[in-house]
């Protein structure tokens, strides 16, 4: 039976030259990351692999250049300087293709650092708000180190992992990282109203993160029977669900359900997701598969872009 151990003991499983996966976005396991970075002087050539992550990424600090090198599929705020300085590499790849890199051994993983809910009475933990590529990583990595946190929502879908699969567990009661909704400007609200006018009743929405997708969601109050099939989602969907605007009833794939790979938002969002059968957190290879997406009606993608 897998047992709980201190972070330092769990991260002693990481050796020089290993490839280590870090879970995505707000599920990035900060205690495990900190314990790994504490061992920087003992390690050389550890490759860190991840998508977008929130929070600290101290392994790419200049003083750890010989110990760690990051290979990232998304360049977020905590990776930009490192990529520009050569302490991290950007791997251009569609997110839907990343699970295949793990499963086919193209990018084999030695260790996966995960952030999960406590096990249920059957021994299953949940990847919670970040299933996306974490499902494939947890299937393929030789060593799974899990930060077990009662604040992690237990979500329905592909994110269940039995404790027998975990190599080491670390207890944690830290608040999850949050991305709080920001007040929208008059211009953003105007853009949101314009885009919302292009969305048809019964449409299936995909939306990104940022002010414009948030502004569009805020302007959908008069719509009906909307559905969600999206890589990620945030707080903007909650009110629309509670007001009966997002129902998913017109969707052909998982009708009635919100389908996503990961979520980033406030504590309110995480509580909304907890044990909510309406929300299906699924493997991103499936969520972002165009053959799946096109089966839904009136698919409408809402994202931000740089001019």
Where does each model-flagged region fall?
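Conserved alpha/beta enzyme-core scaffold
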Residues: 1-307
